[in-house]
From Swiss-Prot:
Subcellular location: Cell inner membrane
Coiled coil, from the record: none
Family as reported in the entry's similarity comment: Belongs to the UPF0761 family.
NCBIfam families: PRK01637.1 (NF002457), yihY_not_rbn (TIGR00765)
Any GO CC annotation of this UniProt entry: plasma membrane
Keywords: Cell inner membrane, Cell membrane, Membrane, Transmembrane, Transmembrane helix
Taxonomic superkingdom: Bacteria
Record-given protein name: UPF0761 membrane protein Ent638_4092
Length: 290
């Protein structure tokens, strides 16, 4: 009986092992960690221009004036663990300086922010191994839509969460609202990753694959935040070595780790579809044999 159980368990785990092997092979062939390093470098160059463009968008919509403050605190608290307060002060100072720029300088900020979108597009289509190229006008429209609608949607979601907080006077809703707000960063990350994996690749991405890959990436991102914050507070080696400049390597390591998670989610998404195709081809080959 134990032998039969072992055989059944081995039979069920064999496909999973084959899928993990295929995933590891794709990660190695796509040089995922190198792509993450490139994106981290571009992200650091584009960080201040991107934030400047986003804050300018909020300034253009007075209805989001209060939400923009909440969004800043939410982003730095949930997406930049351990050193979010320090980084927020520096970035807000840089953005304040950028507001004094001329129209030509402002256009340069927008172009730099769009270059980050182009780098993300190139990296994800490299992972999907897509040779299909979008028209330049269409690509620009997609990048601009992400750059403009993304922050506005995030602001709207924070407005909803603020409304939920205002309902906490109802004792029967108190526990439910607390639970919703507790998992709100996870849901927001899941939605963002799903949109990223669904919209950016030039090939058609099955919705269920994008959902699974986005969920894994969102969970790893939330765990990564907690693990990274624990590491920084428990082993303060960067502070001891770099002193007041410790925020620079800490920010770079966190951005690099974040892109590793994003690209891993993309690899998982594309591997699910590829494994399904390989399995179907193998079954078809076996059926054709006499």
């Amino acid at each position: 009986m134990l032998k039969n159980v072992h055989q059944k368990a081995s039979h069920h785990t064999r496909p999973f092992r084959a899928w993990v092997k295929l995933l590891w092979q794709r990660i190695d062939e796509d040089n995922m960690t190198t792509l993450a390093g490139n994106l981290a470098y571009v992200s650091l160059l584009s960080l201040v221009p991107l934030v400047a463009v986003i804050f300018a968008l909020f300034a253009a919509f007075p209805m989001f004036s209060e939400v923009s403050v909440q969004l800043r605190h939410f982003v730095f608290a949930n997406f930049m663990p351990a050193t979010g307060d320090v980084i927020q002060r520096y970035i807000e100072q840089f953005v304040a300086n950028s507001s004094k720029m001329t129209a030509v300088g402002a256009c340069g900020l927008i172009v730099t922010a769009l270059l980050l979108m182009y780098a993300i597009d190139s990296a994800l289509n490299t992972i999907w191994r897509s040779k299909k190229v979008r028209p330049k006008v269409y690509s620009f429209a997609v990048y601009w839509m992400i750059l403009t609608l993304g922050p506005l949607l995030a602001g709207a979601s924070l407005a909803i969460s603020s409304y939920l907080l205002s309902l906490r006077w109802a004792s029967e809703l108190n526990t439910v609202i607390d639970n919703v707000l507790r998992i709100f960063p996870l849901i927001l990350s899941w939605l963002a990753f799903w949109l990223l994996y669904s919209i950016v690749p030039t090939l058609r991405v099955p919705n269920r694959d994008a959902i699974v890959g986005a969920l894994v990436a969102a969970i790893l991102f939330e765990l990564g935040k907690k693990g990274f914050a624990l590491y920084i507070t428990t082993f303060p080696s960067y502070q001891l070595i770099y002193g007041v400049l410790a925020v620079v390597p800490i920010l770079f390591v966190w951005v690099y780790w974040t892109w590793c998670i994003v690209l891993l989610g993309a690899e998982i998404t594309v591997t699910l579809g590829e494994y399904r195709k390989l399995k179907l081809a193998a079954e078809q080959e076996e059926a054709d044999q006499p």
